[in-house]
């Protein structure tokens, strides 16, 4: 009997020390299994006298029940602890704010276009749109670009057929507007344009904003004043601006406009000039009565200069690490 008591006491201590369900199952097998210590004690009954067997059998059963009860209690306790730990880990604090949907930001090119539209809108310019698939008259002929001009070459222009192409500038919008509306006109035409070029500073598709003002007695001084004010407004600095003589088929005289960079070098930002009389004639406007000026700027180039971006292609790669800087 003393040995049985020691077995039970030992089992109860080990059960209390068990830290997981697997350890408890091992204890059950060690004490109550077919080869367990309690089972071995039952086998000893064969060597006892008939008078001793009932008392010994009762003692073994009591020992077995004591161990089984302790195992059950410990198993229930561990399961309860595990469940409590799981509930704590998965606890939801209903007082915490919900997950808000992250607000996106405007693409830097869109920001630039909106900035340009806002400035010229305050000067009375309206925004006009036109087709991106253009015919040769609106893209070339009406703009005084001759049949053999280099801009018409296959390596510069995406042609569908000899008469139809992806527009190479938004100037076609100006032609269409002058065909349907009479002076005075003040318009800008932002949009996508296409040229067969791709490198660090050129992409096959890019954005352009062109402006047109047609009225009586328009002169180059007005053009200079408007563009000078625009550049200072856009870059938010009192920039040095210069106008260099240049050549464009659709303007005469023509100029390119530079601003002084922070490195002390001049940076080209746009082209401009007085509308060529041939362009006015092509749309039925009398160049003896009306004059006008036009200007054109690459949106990506202005955006690169404003935000200090070195590679034009970054605007089209949709890398959120890059785009999130402009939120």
Swiss-Prot record:
Query: Cofactor stoichiometry and binding?
Result: Binds 2 magnesium ions per tetramer.
Q: Which Pfam families match?
A: Phe_tRNA-synt_N, tRNA-synt_2d
Q: Which residues bind Mg(2+)?
A: 252
**Chief subcellular location:** cytoplasm
GO process terms (BP): phenylalanyl-tRNA aminoacylation
Tell me which GO cellular component terms the UniProt record holds: cytoplasm
Q: Which family does it belong to?
A: Belongs to the class-II aminoacyl-tRNA synthetase family. Phe-tRNA synthetase alpha subunit type 1 subfamily.
What is the recorded name of this protein? Phenylalanine--tRNA ligase alpha subunit
């Amino acid at each position: 009997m003393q040995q049985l008591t020691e077995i039970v006491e030992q089992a109860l201590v080990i059960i209390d020390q068990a830290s997981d369900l697997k350890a408890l199952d091992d204890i059950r097998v060690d004490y109550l299994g077919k080869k367990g210590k309690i089972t071995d004690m039952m086998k000893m009954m064969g060597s006892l006298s008939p008078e001793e067997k009932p008392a010994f059998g009762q003692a073994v059963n009591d020992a077995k029940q004591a161990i089984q009860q302790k195992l059950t209690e410990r198993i229930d306790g561990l399961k309860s602890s595990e469940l409590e730990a799981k509930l704590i880990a998965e606890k939801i604090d209903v007082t915490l704010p919900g997950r808000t949907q992250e607000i996106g930001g405007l693409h830097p090119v869109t920001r630039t276009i909106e900035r340009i539209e806002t400035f010229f809108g305050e000067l009375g310019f309206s925004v006009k749109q036109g087709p991106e698939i253009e015919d040769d008259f609106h893209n070339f002929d009406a703009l005084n670009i001759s049949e053999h001009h280099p801009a018409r070459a296959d390596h510069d222009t995406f042609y569908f057929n000899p008469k139809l192409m992806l527009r190479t500038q938004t100037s076609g919008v100006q032609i269409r507007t002058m065909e349907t509306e009479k002076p005075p006109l003040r318009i800008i035409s932002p949009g996508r344009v296409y040229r067969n070029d791709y490198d660090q500073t050129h992409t096959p598709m890019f954005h352009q904003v062109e402006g047109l003002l047609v009225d009586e007695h328009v002169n180059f001084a007005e053009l200079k004043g408007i563009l000078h004010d625009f550049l200072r407004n856009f870059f938010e600095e009192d920039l040095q601006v210069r106008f260099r003589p240049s050549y464009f088929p659709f303007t005469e005289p023509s100029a390119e406009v530079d601003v002084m960079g922070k490195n002390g070098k001049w940076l080209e930002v746009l082209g401009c000039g007085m509308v060529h009389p041939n362009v006015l004639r092509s749309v039925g406007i009398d160049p003896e009565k009306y004059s006008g000026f036009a200007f054109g700027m690459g949106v990506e180039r202005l955006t690169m200069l404003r935000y200090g971006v070195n590679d034009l292609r970054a605007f089209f790669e949709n890398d959120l690490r890059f785009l999130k800087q402009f939120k």
